[in-house]
Amino acid sequence: MSDLRRKGWWNVPDYFHSPLVFDMEEDKEDYIFGPHDEYLHTLEVHSNTLIQLERWFTPTGQTRVTVVGPLKARLWVMDMIRKVGSKNNLDQIKGKMMLLQIRDHPLRDRDLELHPESGSSLWITTMNDTTFVEVPHFSRFPLTVAWLFCGFVRILGIHNFADLHW
């Protein structure tokens, strides 16, 4: 992560392709980014991402959140937000710990390593050139699906779980 800061990750065009985009309730936004976005800049600097908040974007008053930056950093931010908003108490605690961590100090390389957890709500399995993702029906936040194809990473955003058939 320190290499990204020294080299200026914002100078790499690939980090701006396929941004992570999702809608968030106002109370979750205030909890994560602070009142009047007090923690927004700190979260951006510590995660090497750029986060754009568009308030009242949806008819229901939700905020549209767009995150760009290195893929692993975007996935970490997504995981933190998903866990903070989870109905599962253990995931909520993990999410709150991640939130406190990112407010306190920059992410390290070991923070960005993917560790499949037993009972995790996101399972990724690779078979041949296809990646399958299984998502539980109780997820509250949108999911971004990433897969590697011929050396290129492609991101798919699912913005509304209600559109999916379980």
Swiss-Prot record:
Belongs to the KHDC1 family. InterPro entries: KH_dom_type_1_sf, MOEP19_KH-like. It comes from the Eukaryota. Pfam families: MOEP19. The keyword Repressor does not apply. Residues 19-78 form the KH domain. GO terms for molecular function: RNA binding. This is KH homology domain-containing protein 1C. The keyword Transmembrane does not apply. Keywords: RNA-binding.
